[in-house]
């Protein structure tokens, strides 16, 4: 699956820490993802975005906010477990609270993030279904998050080096 918005691949991806409960940690633990379920028909992951983090709690500008995108084949469902999920779907913004969900069919542009004003961590289950080429599974989520986390760490290293010159 080619994702042009990712740019050139970094040469050394940051290896995530994996907790005893199976959570993969990115951005120093500010973002966690868990495998919930999956088969030929669907994939569901649990994702936790830490409030107050520049990577996961800075609103739409957070490092871990997915770019505005759409899926050719998949229907994506966001089911909020706790916290507040903010979203933009086809240019319209809104929020979801715990117990609420939204279903996004193919070809609908969207992104989502942890709503800053809630001041709480966002815990969301994300399910992707459908298409002849699902292409969205646990391996994709891990690779995408490793890529974002590595790029963020590289930027911080460059900024640190520049401040010392």
Regions found by a protein language model. Give the residues of each.
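Jelly-roll (double-stranded beta-helix
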Residues: 1-75, 79-165
């Amino acid at each position: 699956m080619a994702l042009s918005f990712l740019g050139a691949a970094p040469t050394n991806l940051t290896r995530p820490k994996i907790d005893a409960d199976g959570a993969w940690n990115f951005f120093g633990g500010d973002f966690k993802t868990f495998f919930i379920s999956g088969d030929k028909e669907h994939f569901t992951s649990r994702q936790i975005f830490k409030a107050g983090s520049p990577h996961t709690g800075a609103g739409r500008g957070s490092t871990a906010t997915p770019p505005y995108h759409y899926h050719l084949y998949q229907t994506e469902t966001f089911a909020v477990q706790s916290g507040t999920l903010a979203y933009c779907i086809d240019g319209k913004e809104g929020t979801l609270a715990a117990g609420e969900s939204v279903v996004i069919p193919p070809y609908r542009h969207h992104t989502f993030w942890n709503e800053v004003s809630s001041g709480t961590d966002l815990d969301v289950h994300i399910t992707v279904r459908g298409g002849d080429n699902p292409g969205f599974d646990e391996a994709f989520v891990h690779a995408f998050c490793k890529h974002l986390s590595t790029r963020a760490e590289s930027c911080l290293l460059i900024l640190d080096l520049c401040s010392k010159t």
